[in-house]
Structures are given as structure tokens and as C-alpha cells.
Amino acid sequence: QLQEFAIQKRNISSFIRKIQQYAQYNKKIYTLDFKISEKMAYFLDNVKGKKEIIDKLKISDNLSYMTNNSNKNADFLRNTTNEGNFEKGFSIYLLDKKGEKIYYRISTNTINAAKYPIISIYRAKTPIKLNEDYLKASLWEEEI
């Protein structure tokens, strides 16, 4: 399972970065459609009012995922700005397959003054149970 976490955190963070770079380079708004329900992430372009898939990423069935959105297990959309940032930050948590313990967090921070998001990967110092306060900074360490 450790290898699965390594692969997924790399794949998801690279996918987010790819969308950000396209937006920055093309000066255009794109959409990340993260479908936890389908274990898929989509990179969408808005062409004449229709969403067209530029790329997609299958996320592993061997892990569980949640977000920092109000409905933690719901699918979500994030648009980029045409400068390459996201309209709003988000975090994706990587959990064991049963969805009982959190191991990693991929955070996309848009609050900084820069035009681009900061994409960071944090590792739980020890796996965090869902009923713990997993937002406490002391439970996490940033990976380089």
C-alpha cells in the first residue's frame, strides 16, 4: 500500500500542476473535475459552452479519498484563472482503502500574492483516524 500512496500522490499532484500550467501558458480558464465517485479526475476545456476532456487520470481503487470541502466525499470542480491559479484552494486526502485512516494530504493554496497556486504534499506523522482533528498542523509534515 505504501507504493500505492507514492504513485497516487505523485500522479494527482502532477495532474493538478498540468492543468495549472496549461492555464498559465494559454491564458485560459480550464476546469479540474475531481470525481471521487468514479475514482477519476478530468482536465476539461470549455469550448463553445461545452466541456471537452483534454486529459483524464484514473485514481487507484486501492485507496480512499476525501476533500476539505463541506461534503468531504463529494465530487468537486475547480476552475483555473486565466493567469494559472485556481479560483479557490482545495485539499485532497489519501486514505487507506477502508477510508479509516488518513496518510497524505495534497494541498493547493491560492491565498498567496503570486499568480500561481502552491501545491504541497503533507505526510501524516502517524496515520490519522477520521475522528481525530486531522486539520491540526502538528499532525503533519511537509514532504520536499
Task: Kindly give the residue locations of the regions a language model identified.
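N-terminal helix-rich module
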Residues: Q3, I7, Q21, Y25, ...
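Phosphate-interacting basic helix/loop segments used at nucleotide- and nucleic-acid interfaces
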Residues: S13-Q21
